[in-house]
Regions:
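Transmembrane beta-barrel domains of Gram-negative outer membranes and organellar outer membranes
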Residues: 3-180, 193-274
């Protein structure tokens, strides 16, 4: 059966503290996650074709702490940094941060106060994370280089996990919803982005897990001639608990299909400290 918020166990940190689980008062959860997306194919207007390589690097820091012993509410802050290069530049050029006109941009792009709570007390491993993203970008695109959205975003992420009785398998599900407020100069003005996902993990040992996942991305515009897109993403990865406080994760994913989107792949590494 699934593990509730109030139930103690001898499981490892990576087994017990999924994104569905809230922190107790005085606990801290700090996650540094890095995503490198690179593409050489895209599908727009119903046509799939080769394109010059574009690469988008996103680095986020999420900090949360608990406010009560009953794990009823967590508060946090999300920070996002981006570095993008286009026009056939090498994927690793995102780490040069050279700001070359017409091919590169980088900078801190947004921050977001956030809360995390459990709306149904009888289901302790179902939680919602709400965040209000405040943009630090004036222009989404400069010299043909996109950096990030310049509009406000209200994000809600719905988390649920289920641990199978043998303890070796765990299913984690998420629905990420992002409403982009009306902003005339934003490509996603007055739109809703939905990203459901399912992650199946196998634990050969309590401190190590391998996983596979599937996600779908759907951007729905409420404008008469707004931009819309969709994509299906398949991926795999692993997590390892380095110490009682620190774990590392590696993920790979591939955009296997889509409409009006790039068909690239992502390489991800994250570090999470919980104390």
């Amino acid at each position: 059966m699934a593990i509730g918020q109030e139930k103690e166990s001898n499981r490892s940190i990576i087994q017990e503290y999924t994104p569905s689980i809230l922190l107790r008062k005085g606990q801290w959860d700090i996650k540094w996650f890095n995503n490198l997306y690179t593409e050489t194919r895209a599908t727009f207007g119903g046509n799939e074709s080769d394109i010059a390589r574009n690469t988008f690097f996103t680095s986020t820091v999420d900090v949360f702490t608990g406010l009560s012993e009953s794990r009823s509410l967590n508060v946090g802050l999300l920070l996002e940094f981006r570095s993008n290069v286009i026009g056939g530049r090498d994927a690793l050029d995102v780490f040069s941060f050279d700001g070359e006109s017409g091919s590169a941009r980088s900078g801190l792009t947004s921050f977001a106060p956030a809360i995390k709570f459990n709306p149904i007390k009888s289901i302790g491993n179902f939680t919602i994370q709400s965040a209000f993203h405040i943009p630090l970008v004036d222009n989404e695109t400069e010299d043909n280089v996109f950096l990030d959205q310049n509009g406000y975003i209200f994000q809600n992420r719905f988390f649920y996990d289920y641990s199978f009785s043998d303890g070796d398998w765990q299913l984690f599900t998420e629905l990420n919803s992002e409403y982009s407020f009306k902003e005339e100069t934003s490509f996603a003005s007055n739109s809703l982005r939905l990203i459901p996902g399912a992650f199946l993990s196998y634990f050969p040992s309590p401190k190590f897990t391998v996983l596979g996942f599937v996600q779908h991305l759907q951007l729905i515009s409420f404008e008469t001639e707004g931009f819309e897109q969709d994509a299906t993403i398949l991926g795999t990865g692993a997590k390892y608990q380095l110490s009682d406080e620190l774990n590392i994760e590696l993920l790979y994913s591939n955009f296997v299909r889509g409409n009006d989107t790039g068909l690239g792949q992502t390489f991800n590494i994250g570090l999470r400290a919980l104390f």
